[in-house]
Amino acid sequence: MSNFVDKTQNLPLDNSFNDGNVLTIKTVQIAPFRTLMTALKDILLETNITFQPDGIRIINMDKSHTILAHLFLAAKNFEFYECKKSKIVIGVNMFHLFKLINSIDNDDTLTIYIENSDYVDGIVSHLALKFENGEIKQCKTQKLRLIEPEPEELEYPDVKFSSIINLPSADFQKIIRDLSCISEKLEIKSVGNELIFKCSGQFASAEIHRAESDGSMGFVLKQDSSKIIQGEFSLKNLSYFIKCTNLCNQIEVYLENDLPLVVKYDVASLGSIKLCLAPLPSS
């Protein structure tokens, strides 16, 4: 099964190069890709990455099983995307992948590919990365040694939320950073037209009330006015979330009683990542 997207009118394409690969993906959106790797390496040490004709997926939990990351980058959003199999699953050490991706310059074109010789009976031994800079006529190729993928494939649960809030990503980052100085726990509450952030520590307590306003906070979905939605969450874990801040200007926050908090970031124009955090047990 083969599917490809080609938006490379202004990029050089080597058809013989693509013919030698079971997977070829090309993008010029370098900064968001690096930001994504920076965030994921602190949440997922090792993970499966699934490539299918429609795009790239990661669905995995951190080691403590309190954070679930769900990433989908659509094939149509890349400059070039060709996956010649119905599904290719690889196992990756995210810190090692980050070390390779982190050396790329913003002016480079990134090609992610798997050579036919590295794909044997569905098992992939290496993931290749090519950094091309047309200005200085430089091409760097790196090959990451892969690990054995996890046999169990997780699914993202289909859950209904009563409250979905749109909020500037920079504002959410500042709230988490400010309150992390005071406490280890954060209560998030959705009441009427307000979103409330509340915490208490050994030397201080703090409360931030955020109301709807044009161009800032707004409810995408609002719960019944008589319903209060609240949960308590680890600020340390939320500090991992805000490493995604530079991916987009606005985030969506999903809230429901007794369910994980979900924060959705757009990965520039490539797709989105949802980060889910289990609530702390009631004290």
Question: Where do the language-model regions lie?
Answer:
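DNA polymerase sliding clamps and clamp-related checkpoint/processivity subunits
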Residues: 1-41, 45-181, 187-283
